Amino acid sequence: GAMKVYLRPETAQGIFVNYLNVQKTGRMKIPFGIAQIGKAFRNEIVARQFIFRMREFEQMEMQFFVHPGTEIDYFKRWKETRMKWHQALGFGAENYRFHDHEKLAHYANAATDIEFHMPFGFKEVEGIHSRTDFDLSQHEKFSGRSIKYFDPQTKESFTPYVIETSIGVDRMFLSVMCHSYREEQLENGETRVVLLLPPALAPTKLAVMPLVKKDGLPEKAREIVDNLKFHFNTHYDEKDTIGKRYRRQDAVGTPYCVTVDYDTLKDNTVTLRFRDTMEQERVSIDQLQSIIEDKVSISSLLKKLQ
């Protein structure tokens, strides 16, 4: 039967009721978008598949406002742009696919899902919808107030059409973790647990380690940490053997490890180790920031979308 619902099922409606305020204060012209992240709630009868389907979850949504008649073109553009974004994470194009909706919701004239190959099959991680003017028209109807956009060039007022992109952050997190976790058999017979996180998403970008806890090596390592910590999240680790420290950082997805040894004190170089291949190279301390920043920054990932 009917029941009262107090918690929002999506973040979108807050954007719709405020879009004109944002447009005016931001002096924006159509087309423009408003993005938001926040909690949403669904009355799921069966919450299942770990964090894939929950009653309380995090959404990242964007509503992109366009002129009526142009919505399908913008829908196609956002469809391709969003797929590029997912593929830029580096999990392989073969693990993503579109699922176009045959049956559309009452408010939509086009809709598709981006699906990711989870361990339990291809599942939706993002939805892209052309919502027409349904939401804004309904808010106008029930509030009795006009929220039409005035075009200063054509001197016309109209209700914009909306393209929506909606990501379930928890599902996105699940897809990243499922694809990143590995248990690798090494040549020496050992097993390595490694989290192959995209460097831009890794919470810690770099671990700095003195080879031993004496002879000025910890002090030199701390000096490197102090210089780099303003540029990206850097961790200092001096406990256990260097091999165990490498394994620890592999398991939490840290892309790079820097080892300070006795040669460092002589020539100001360090050993730089890459998580994915375990390969090591000797680099100057002065080069560390530029080498690592190029690989781990979110801007490097976003450049792939151009």
Regions inferred by a protein language model and the residue ranges of each:
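NTP/phosphate- and nucleic-acid-binding module
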Residues: 1-306
